[in-house]
Amino acid sequence: MLTTQVTVVVATRNRRPGLCRTLEYLAALPERPPIVVVDNGSTDGTADAVREKFPQVELVLLRRNLGAHARNYGVHRARTRYVALSDDDSWWEPGALTRAVRVLEDHPRLGLVAGTTLVGEEDDPDPLNAVLAASPLTRGALPGPRVLGFLGCAAVARRDAFLAAGGYSRLLRIGGEEELLAYDLAALGWPISYRPDVVVHHWPSAARDPRRRRAQELRNHVLIGWLRRPLAHALAETGWLAAAARRDRDPVTSRALAEALLNLPRALSRRRLLPPSVEADIQLLEHSNAA
């Protein structure tokens, strides 16, 4: 079966009940994919619960929280050609992995399939679905709209492409980390295509702090500018965040600015401009989204 070629990788930290629910759904999938859980240093008995209730799951234990970078450890452990990336509060719809693998098999230069995400008990469409579906980028021979973004819980990637691009950045940890990976895949010639028939269900954990997540996203947007974008863009984004923090005196923007500046030396040491064609695509998307 095609679906034996995909491993589901889940990163988690201190969300034992939600993770167990997710693993119940994943274990019941008709595709029966191998599952790797990477535990980001949980202290709530997560590892013991996985061992007891899901002995078939491969468990990777990290000593501390590495954020989204932890997924890289799971991808390295995978022995399949493709990897399906999941959160501890999301799961794939039956048949979704079969469809994703078939698309990747039929398009050998495709690096990643971005799926569609349905949120909560009501299956509300995530707003990103419409954004990806309306991408203005030229599609070419791809099986769906060509995009430069995806949700981390709704992606099926070619394992070799994921690893060649460096996976998820350790510097960014969490909060918009998919953006940098999408850019780096494109820079290596591995496009991403959106497929509305590859469906994920996401029930966001109540333990998520929306203000903290917003600060992380703002911080990482600035850092990505310094990591990959032209100098003028990086300066403009940093200036915007500094002005917002000074004007609003909001703890969210202030924290984002402080963390961005703290991590700026590390970002500069990793700075690598994107190919002109990828930068042009990013600018096209930015102009389209601003319209």
Per-region residue spans from a language model:
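A short, conserved alpha-helix in the catalytic core of glycosyltransferases
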Residues: 149-157, 161-166, 171-199
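Short aromatic/hydrophobic "clamp" motif used to bind/position activated sugar donors
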Residues: 83
